[in-house]
């Protein structure tokens, strides 16, 4: 392990619609920056409108990484994110440029900075078996199965939280150990992250209502911009299912329900806005658990300038 001081890497984190992209591009206009996306939805190709993916014009301002890297049928894990980000950070730094992490998937950021528990990779065959069981019995029945095996994990999951129920059962089927036991084990340590000091700059709202209004406006703009047609095209591929991680992304799940005829347009729109606000709430809870973060009020009309000042002070 090298004895040099860790190099500071600024990380611009915040909930959806908090102004991360604008601030990142403003920094790119001042410094030779390469942006590493910290967003579990932006990894998917063919999912542009509903993920608020940076436009071609925005991506031309600075190189962007970890965007459009997997097909919507594929899984992309926090472990993959960590490995990719550590590799990219070193490569960008070696080019004499500034790596800038930007996003709101706090699980990815936690994996990067705190390491990972020794959990197995996703297994397509096991997942297919569990999906078939769920189609036959329903997710509440699989939740009950999980409760018998791992009551600690089951107690913190809703009976219809298909993604996490499936993952907990998958882990048990692959390892013979419960998710709660594996998560309680010591985190695997490595030296690869010790080269860097990842510093979180958090865009947080002083007034939640301001951010909620932005979220509503953004979701309506997505709908006006062709979001439904985007999901129609994804469905027409014929190889995507609503249970897949890509189609569970906020907004896509609600539009899929609408196209199934399960809800009307108005209900779909309201559920999409509500789900985005709930995601925002979870993101803010994660952020506020980081005492080391530098907070910038995203409701401040000069928020972008405040972010630039905070980053420049670190470098």
Curated annotation (Swiss-Prot):
Q: Where does substrate bind?
A: 16-21
Q: Which UniProt keywords apply?
A: ATP-binding, Magnesium, Nucleotide-binding, Transferase, tRNA processing
Q: Which domain of life is it from?
A: Bacteria
Per the record's keyword annotation, is Transferase included, yes or no? Answer: yes
Annotated site, Interaction with substrate tRNA, chain positions: 105, 127
Region called Interaction with substrate tRNA, residue ranges: 39-42, 163-167, 248-253
For binding ATP, which residues are annotated in this chain's numbering? 14-21
Q: Which Pfam families match?
A: IPPT (PF01715)
Question: Which cofactors, by name?
Answer: Mg(2+)
Q: What class of enzyme is it?
A: transferase
Catalysed reaction, written as an equation: adenosine(37) in tRNA + dimethylallyl diphosphate = N(6)-dimethylallyladenosine(37) in tRNA + diphosphate
State if Transmembrane helix is listed as a keyword: no
Functionally, this protein is described as follows: Catalyzes the transfer of a dimethylallyl group onto the adenine at position 37 in tRNAs that read codons beginning with uridine, leading to the formation of N6-(dimethylallyl)adenosine (i(6)A).
Q: Which family does the record claim for this protein?
A: Belongs to the IPP transferase family.
Subunit structure of this chain's protein: Monomer.
- Annotated protein name in UniProt: tRNA dimethylallyltransferase
Species the sequence originates in: Paraburkholderia phytofirmans (strain DSM 17436 / LMG 22146 / PsJN)
Organism placement in taxonomy = Bacteria, Pseudomonadati, Pseudomonadota, Betaproteobacteria, Burkholderiales
**Could you tell me the gene encoding this protein?**
miaA
């Amino acid at each position: 392990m090298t004895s040099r001081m860790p190099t500071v890497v600024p990380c611009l984190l915040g909930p959806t619609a908090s102004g991360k992209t604008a601030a990142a591009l403003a920094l790119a206009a001042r410094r030779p920056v390469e942006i590493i996306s910290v967003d579990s939805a932006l990894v998917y190709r063919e999912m542009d409108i509903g993920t608020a993916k940076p436009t071609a014009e925005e991506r031309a301002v600075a190189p962007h990484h970890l965007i459009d890297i997997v097909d919507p049928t594929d899984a992309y894990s926090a472990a993959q994110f960590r490995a990719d980000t550590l590799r990219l950070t070193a490569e960008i730094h070696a080019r004499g440029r500034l790596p800038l992490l930007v996003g709101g998937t706090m699980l990815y950021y936690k994996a990067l900075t705190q390491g990972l528990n020794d959990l197995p990779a996703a297994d397509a065959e096991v997942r297919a078996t569990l999906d078939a069981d769920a189609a036959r019995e329903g997710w509440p029945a699989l939740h009950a199965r999980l409760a018998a095996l791992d009551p600690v994990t089951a107690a913190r999951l809703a009976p219809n939280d298909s993604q996490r129920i499936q993952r907990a059962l998958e882990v048990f089927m692959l390892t013979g150990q419960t998710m709660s036991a594996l998560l309680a084990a010591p985190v695997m340590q490595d030296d690869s992250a010790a080269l860097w000091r990842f510093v979180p700059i958090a865009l947080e709202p002083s007034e939640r209502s301001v951010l909620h209004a932005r979220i509503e406006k953004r979701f309506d703009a997505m709908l006006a911009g062709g979001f439904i047609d985007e999901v129609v095209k994804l469905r027409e591929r014929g190889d995507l299912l609503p249970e897949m991680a890509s189609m569970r992304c906020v907004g896509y799940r609600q539009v899929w329900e609408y196209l199934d005829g399960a809800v009307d347009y108005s209900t779909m729109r309201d559920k999409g806005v509500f789900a985005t606000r709930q995601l925002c709430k979870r993101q803010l809870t994660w952020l506020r658990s980081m005492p080391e973060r530098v907070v910038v009020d995203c409701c401040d009309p000069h928020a972008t300038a405040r972010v630039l000042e905070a980053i420049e002070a670190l470098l």
